[in-house]
Amino acid sequence: NYCKKNKLILIFDEMITGLRFNCSSVQNQFNLKPSISTFGKWLGGGLPIGIIGIKKNIIKKLDKNKKKIFFGGTFSGNSINTFIANRLVRYVYKNKKNIFDNLDKKSEFIQKEINLFLKKNNIDANCVRFSSMIRLVFTKKNIINRSQRDFFENQKKKIISEFRKYLFENKIYYPSSGIIFIATSTSYKQINHFIKISKKAFKRIKNSR
């Protein structure tokens, strides 16, 4: 309503969040209607892809321009990437209940196990989750946005680096973004290994302080 009232274009970057929530996105979860949306990541099925969704009223205004607007990129219009993305979305949508129930269940298990450990050992960290997306936050405080998270974590760069290094030494790649995604193929054996090593890493950084 604010954007509409002030004649502003609302743009959503859903590169990470696109179709991750029961085959829907953040805008669907909160009933928001951006004018422009961007998607990518898993939609390519392992291949690089970027998708832009633009509302018809925006496209019509662009079309009124006498000069043609050029959209280009290394993988623009790549038939293989587009074919795979199309098939992948169709498959996921058709099987979304089984897929997302599986992902949510595994993600919830990780969050519960890690938070129980952190609370029991009085460690200043927290495992947060939105559907199947997980993030280890290195503060107990109830953060409400990225700026707050970065404020606290910037004070613990060395600790986070040690945590990441320990996981890497135990054959677990912990991304620099800190966001953890679970796949349907991820087994509980792998999940328990991640939890076990994460607990050891947390204990290690706590004792080193």
What are these regions (language model features)?
Residues 1-209:
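Conserved N-terminal phosphate-binding loop of PLP-dependent enzymes in the Aspartate aminotransferase
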